[in-house]
Regions:
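Helix-boundary and N-terminal cytosolic regulatory elements
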Residues: 1-131, 200, 204-216
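Short, well-ordered turn and helix-capping elements at secondary-structure junctions
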Residues: 91-93, 172, 212, 252, ...
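Switch/coupling subdomain of P-loop NTPase systems
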Residues: 99-179
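Alpha-helical transmembrane anchor segments
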Residues: 270, 274-311
Length: 311
């Protein structure tokens, strides 16, 4: 079975295979029209889905480990074995209804980088990172470029959240907004997902940096160090926004307390004003037979007059 052709539900499906030309650093889509134009020794980037990855012929060490990890993807991670480097990346949804979360796995073995996904998002990302490649670019660097491309627009997403929270703050200052808790909980959930995502990416970057150091790949090590620093800045920005969110919640609670204090002040004034009347009502509500006012024909009018004077 050719790696380029995988039988699936009775049809022949072409995998997307790219050749990375080491000398020029160019990335080109392989064209196989019955002729093996490219050299098999050239580094290859192969996009395929899970079923195709499972059906690949040949010896791919620890492939079952990656397949097992990809069945239930909940977080991003990377693992290095003696023969290969593999991992999964879970990219959370970022706010907009048009955006969606997606996940993919990667498997780096010899001169091949397999990118396994079901959502067909990586082809666009590869087209984007083609311009970043340079002479002598390696598959390790290609993987780094992909990871960098995944967070290119994250700062804009976080800035949008901060701007929206500023609008919420302006409303809270003027009045007590409706559905405040629902809005805050939505932003809190988004920020929690982003924080966990960046923590996982920092762990991945740290791991890859140590791996490159062990393999004496100096340029790749420096690249992963820069990536980790970039992710760390995004993580710190998320923490700053989370603190800002907490300040807005405290401001909202302060407004609630002020509003409740105003109500209690009004109730206290009303209670104080009507206290004498309440006292009179309590006295005469007991209906003791020894009260002289009950025997006096002007007693009723006298009590009314006293009440009016107190009020």
């Amino acid at each position: 079975m050719n790696e380029n052709r995988i039988m699936r539900k009775g049809a022949v499906r072409e995998m997307n295979r790219y050749w990375l030309h080491a000398a020029s650093g160019e990335l080109s889509l392989a064209r196989d029209n019955g002729k093996n134009i490219e050299k098999e020794s050239e580094p290859q980037i192969i996009l395929l889905n899970m079923e195709e990855f499972q059906q690949l012929e040949g010896n791919y060490p620890h492939r079952k480990n990656l397949i097992s990890s990809m069945r239930f993807i909940r977080y991003s991670k990377v693992e290095a074995f003696h023969e290969c480097v593999q991992g999964i990346i879970h990219v959370p949804k970022q706010g907009s209804k048009k955006e969606k979360e997606f996940s993919f796995g990667f498997y780096l073995f010899e001169n091949k980088l397999f990118l396994i996904e079901e959502d067909e998002e990586l082809q666009e990302i590869l087209a984007k990172v083609k311009n970043d490649m340079f002479d002598g670019c390696t598959l390790h660097m290609v993987l780094l470029f992909i990871c960098n491309a995944l967070i290119d627009n994250d700062i804009l997403y976080l800035q949008k959240i901060e701007e929206n929270l500023e609008k919420v703050e302006d409303v809270v200052i003027k009045r007590i907004p409706e559905h405040f808790n629902e809005v805050i909980m939505r932003y809190r959930k988004q920020l929690s997902e982003s924080r966990a995502y960046y923590e996982q990416l920092m762990n991945m970057g740290d791991f890859m940096q140590m791996y490159m150091n062990r393999e004496s790949l100096v340029e790749e090590e420096q690249g992963w160090e820069r990536y980790m620093n970039r992710v760390e800045r995004l993580h710190n920005y998320v923490e700053t926004i989370r603190e800002y969110l907490q300040q807005i919640r405290e401001m909202y609670q302060t407004q609630i307390d002020i509003h409740q204090n105003r109500i209690m002040s009004i109730l206290t004034i009303v209670t104080t004003l009507f206290l004498p009347l309440t006292l009179i009502t309590g006295w005469y509500g007991m209906n003791f037979p020894g009260m002289p006012e009950f025997q006096w024909k002007y007693g009723y009018l006298a009590v009314i007059g006293v009440s009016v004077l107190f009020f």
